[in-house]
């Protein structure tokens, strides 16, 4: 069958500031009203939020480097966690770079590693706990072409 998991509302704010023309810093915040979603797995917990901070530096007209961090805090209570549905609070660290071939073509690369916490939940067997955790690494490559 179908499972609804709509988010009734999301608040997103962000800002970027150029410290000097070649250095930019940015911050963002997201708040999800996912606890109140129809079909939501969150029954007893709270809503989810994320905070993001990043920076970019144009080393010269060809090269750019970037770094960032994102903290995600899920609102799951123990009763909301199961083998079929779990999200774990995390902090992601990201690094990236870009090479600009000319005004029309740019190669972008990035790497992200997420550090997840553990969530211990009383297991079905008496005296046993289920421990939920995960690992995540991601690599991204893209090529921008401006027409």
Predicted regions and their residues:
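Outer-membrane beta-barrel porins/channels
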Residues: 1-147
């Amino acid at each position: 069958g179908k499972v609804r998991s709509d988010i009734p509302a999301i608040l997103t704010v962000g800002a970027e500031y150029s410290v000097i023309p070649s250095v930019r810093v940015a911050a963002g915040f997201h708040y999800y009203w996912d606890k109140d979603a129809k079909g939501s797995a969150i029954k007893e917990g709270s809503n989810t939020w994320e905070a993001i901070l990043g920076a970019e530096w144009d080393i010269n007209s060809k090269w750019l480097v970037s770094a960032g961090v994102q903290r995600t805090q899920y609102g799951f209570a123990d009763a909301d966690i199961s083998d079929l549905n779990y999200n774990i609070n995390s902090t992601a660290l990201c690094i990236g770079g870009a090479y600009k071939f000319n005004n029309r073509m740019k190669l972008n690369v990035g790497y992200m590693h997420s550090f997840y916490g553990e969530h211990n939940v009383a297991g079905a067997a008496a005296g046993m706990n289920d421990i939920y955790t995960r690992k995540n690494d991601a690599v991204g490559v893209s090529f921008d072409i401006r027409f």
